[in-house]
Amino acid sequence: MKNVINQLYWDRMSETYLYGTAFKKNAKNEVTFKNKLMPSGKTLISWSSIANYQVTKEVPSLPLLLNGQEYLLKISAKIKPENSAIFGIHFFDIQGNEIDKVIFTNLEQKFKYPTRAVKYTIKIISGGVEEINFKKIQISPLDLEEEVFNDFYPHPIYLNKNSQKEGLILLDDSKRARIIAPFKIESYVGANLIIGYLSWQNKQRGFELLKDYIKEHQDKKLVIFSSSADIDKSLENFKSLNCTVVYSEDFVNKGYYNLQETYLSKNYRESDQVRMVKKAINYFEE
């Protein structure tokens, strides 16, 4: 089973409260919402797991969830005044009746998807909000470790404490999800292998964490494998560090490394992590 962190953004203008609102969105899909006169109790924005395409011409904005499974919802946002936003997760049955809800004001919340639910919505409601600087909401299975949400997350797929070699495969997150490799390698491959996931929305912070990771692993013969031309550019600043870099043109095919994905890209890609791991294994066997 894949461990998937679904990521959603403030991209539903039809569901946004605009009366008297100053609204800004940048290329990273980060939103600034300002409205000092908005009455308490009004909904700033809502998302739904089901949409009537013929009416709204929009697809559902929330991922499908499994009945009876527990999840963690994390909100990346700064709210002024603090704790003045009220968040609600509402669950509905097949008749459209609300069967349960979770209301909270903190930026992290556990919840269980009811067994009878066929739809859910997420809302941000004003409790005296004047400004929100909003990045994203992340929804994941509850049992994932906390570090998996970081802007750079190193995920080991093969570890041998006696090996002095290490391969680190760098992957950009998809705009809609971070998909953690659902496999481990059992047999010896000549080096420790790690897949490093980089946030597309906050890549600068991700590379700062990557530099710290490299310094912490200076006792290893570290080889970094790049999977995109965009990562190649950032790795140009790593030449002074004690590591070897295999750039994307030598690691993946040209059609892939030239495919630069942004939030508004028409092309959707999911990294072929199995193929990249095989390429890294071959590198250490040569």
Tell what function each PLM region has.
Residues M1-E286:
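Extracellular and organelle-lumenal recognition/adhesion modules and their flexible linkers in secreted
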